Amino acid sequence: MAASNQSEVNIGMVGHVDHGKTSLTRKLTGVWTDTHSEELKRGISIRLGYADCEIKKCETCDEPECYTVDKKCDACGGKVDTLRKISFVDAPGHETLMATMLSGASLMDGAILVIAASEECPQPQTKEHLMALDALGVEHILIVQNKIDLVTEEAAIENYNQIKEFTKGTVAENAPIIPVSAHHGANLDVLLKAIQEFIPTPKRDETLTPKLYVARSFDVNKPGSEIKDLKGGVIGGSIIQGALKVGDDLEIRPGIKVTEGNKTHWVPIITKIISLGVGNKKLKTASPGGLIGVGTELDPNLTKSDALSGSLAGLPGTLPETLEKMVIKPQLLERVVGSQDELIIEPLKTNEVLMLNVGTSTTVGVTVSARADKAEIKLKLPVCADKGDRVAISRKIGSRWRLIGYGIIL
């Protein structure tokens, strides 16, 4: 277990809309991640939601009953030891919010694909989310067959067989399938045991220069606050390498758009780290793993309403260049997933508009040149990314962006 209050691993909660991702996250963490007013109204996740939990184990009970997230053993009421703290990234399942799911996938060390037993499998975004995990290199996957309380045993077995058939030949072919009722809390102990066994904590190298993927940014000041009480802007995200500490200077790229005459360019933002936190707990140093809040000296106007989400942050002078165009080696899927007609994917074409996700950023670009092994794309919004980074590629088909593959930055 990590010595600090930090989580050790980020696990994505993905799957089709309304299959129970947010309910399962709440059952494991006690946190309802849909807190945005529009989310509460519509009953779906719109932004990425985050919540932490500690996996604990009873010293005396047998497996899997010995696993819990509570302060005492659910089976015997006895003492429990904390094994690991984990962060869940709850991604939206609605097809119009695929870009948000893709930007969240870059934070994931593993994923739980939630599939409702009460609907035929696969549903469109079940397919699309699994392809996205594959495209972005998320390998450690568990499948939760949720809502088993709503179906007969025969229907649950039929749905299980559909899941096995659907995952054949994918990154999740050998993933354990765990029947669960998030609503009733049934089989959560089995799920916790599987998380411990199948989603390992990645090996982290804290000696590398720090890099933080920014997934959210906020103005934490309440309207009408006195000037003397105002706090600087807050950014939230995941450190992917190295460590940051309170007092460090921080560079955020791409930064601010500056227009001079008829030319525009982007200027990195430099600020200082005032505080680091996980939930309500303060840290002096933050390392990879979990989702971190970083308090800064920035004008809160720069951070409000996720204005800096998609940025990359690190020590000044250590970040990669900001790219206004990128050259990638594309790897396209055979067919479009997530739509009714699974069309064959055509090669990239010159002058076509694509949506690209790299790290936590989403941008749109136009292909300047396109060959089978190399494509050059001019970006509408620049990104800060390294050579070798993976980029998810989506194409507009009908009125929706559809994932068509990924590329490696050359």
Swiss-Prot record:
List, alphabetically, the GO terms of the cellular component aspect: cytosol
Report whether Ribosomal protein shows up as a keyword of the record. Answer: no
Annotated spans, G3: 90-93
Q: Which residues bind GTP?
A: 18-23, 146-149, 181-183
Give every tr-type G domain span.
6-203
Q: Where is this region: G5?
A: 181-183
Coiled-coil spans are none
Segments carrying the region annotation (G1) are 15-22
**Which EC number(s) are documented for this chain?**
3.6.5.3
**Family stated for the protein in its record:** Belongs to the TRAFAC class translation factor GTPase superfamily. Classic translation factor GTPase family. EIF2G subfamily.
**Record's function text:** eIF-2 functions in the early steps of protein synthesis by forming a ternary complex with GTP and initiator tRNA.
Protein name listed in UniProt: Translation initiation factor 2 subunit gamma
Report the gene name: eif2g
